[in-house]
């Protein structure tokens, strides 16, 4: 379930999946057991949704299977709490470029502005890395002490990427 992105990558995923001739392309993410749609403009409306092969070989969308058999797929307690939403998205990611600085919504913001019951809390388990343009990969997390909302807003609006990176730990 490779998902299109504006950046390139995926050679490590190709290698992990035993693909011949691993290469970086615009599908640097593998969404695992996904019931989430990518929503990238101009892409297929079902991109990101995982498909499950049934014993007879028919492929069905996991989200459709869960909606048809919610308690059998997720359990009664899960359905009572979250309905047919998984509430999690697992991605395998291999980027061949520095990813953009990202800010993820809280659940409250997502509900009010994005029509979603979920924010985007993330956890990362790094299995392998590779240099990108000669730079050893690294992850920035959170703001340095003293960075104000007004300062960061100004930097983002100016699209000053080095300054954005400079505000992060």
PLM-predicted stretches and their roles:
Residues 1-147:
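Transition-metal
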Residues 148-169:
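Active-site glycine-rich loop that binds ribose-phosphate moieties when present
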């Amino acid at each position: 379930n490779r998902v299109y992105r504006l950046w390139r990558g995926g050679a490590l995923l190709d290698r992990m999946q035993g693909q011949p001739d691993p290469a970086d392309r615009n599908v640097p993410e593998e969404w695992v057991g996904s019931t989430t749609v990518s929503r990238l403009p101009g892409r297929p409306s079902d991109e990101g949704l995982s498909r499950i092969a049934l014993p007879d070989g028919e492929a069905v969308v996991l989200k459709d299977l869960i909606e048809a058999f919610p308690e059998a797929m997720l359990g009664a307690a899960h359905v009572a709490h979250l309905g047919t939403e998984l509430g999690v998205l697992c991605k395998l990611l291999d980027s061949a470029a520095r990813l953009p600085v990202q800010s993820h919504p809280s659940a409250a913001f997502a509900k009010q502005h994005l029509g979603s019951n979920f924010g985007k809390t993330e956890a990362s388990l790094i299995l392998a890395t590779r240099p990108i343009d000669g730079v050893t990969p690294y992850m920035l997390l959170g703001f340095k002490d003293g960075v104000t909302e007004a300062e960061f807003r100004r930097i983002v609006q100016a699209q000053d990427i080095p300054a954005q990176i400079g505000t992060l730990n």
